[in-house]
A protein has these predicted regions:
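Non-ligating segments of multi-cofactor redox enzymes
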Residues: 1-164
């Protein structure tokens, strides 16, 4: 078992499996959230196919959603360009509608372990460390791209959908 897998296993056993409601995070190029349910039903999912980071997945309801389990969003515009039903449009570019925060009770750094896994991939330098072991996310700098989420070995970064 690799180190990252070990930490993920340990932290998931602390959180309690199956207790969380599914969080649906939409790609960042929409203006009308209801259009996902009405316009995506007959689409072939090109937004997911062309996503460079492969974070767009098509759910059972045939609508696109983001999964930060392996990577984050670069805001490259490819999903909006590929969207034939025009649910995603470049002119509607916005930040991903989630709030991101570090859960101090499951964060390895907050427990005294030297870990910078969340800070390293952050292109906006939004993760700041108070002293050496207390990371926080500067919400003014954070673009909610999700790169920190996939890199955290203890899954200590929580996501909250801001709008629906």
């Amino acid at each position: 078992m690799e180190r990252r897998e070990l930490f993920s296993f340990l932290s998931s056993s602390l959180k309690g499996a199956g207790n969380e409601k599914e969080i649906i995070i939409r790609p960042p190029y929409y203006s009308d959230i209801t259009a996902f349910d009405t316009e995506c039903q007959n689409c072939d999912g090109k937004c997911a196919t062309l996503c460079q980071e492969q974070i767009i997945i098509i759910g059972e309801d045939k609508t696109p959603r983001l999964s930060f389990s392996s990577s984050g969003c670069t805001y490259c515009d490819d999903c909006a360009i590929a969207c034939e039903p025009d649910v995603l449009r470049i002119e509607d570019r916005r930040l991903i509608d989630v709030g991101v925060r570090i859960n101090e009770s499951t964060c390895m750094s907050w427990s005294g372990v030297m870990c910078f896994s969340c800070k390293d991939p952050c292109l906006e330098d939004a993760i700041e460390f108070k002293a050496m072991f207390m990371p926080t996310i500067d919400q003014e700098k954070c673009t909610s791209c999700g790169f920190c989420i996939s890199r955290c070995p203890s899954t200590a970064i929580d996501i909250k959908v801001m709008s629906s």
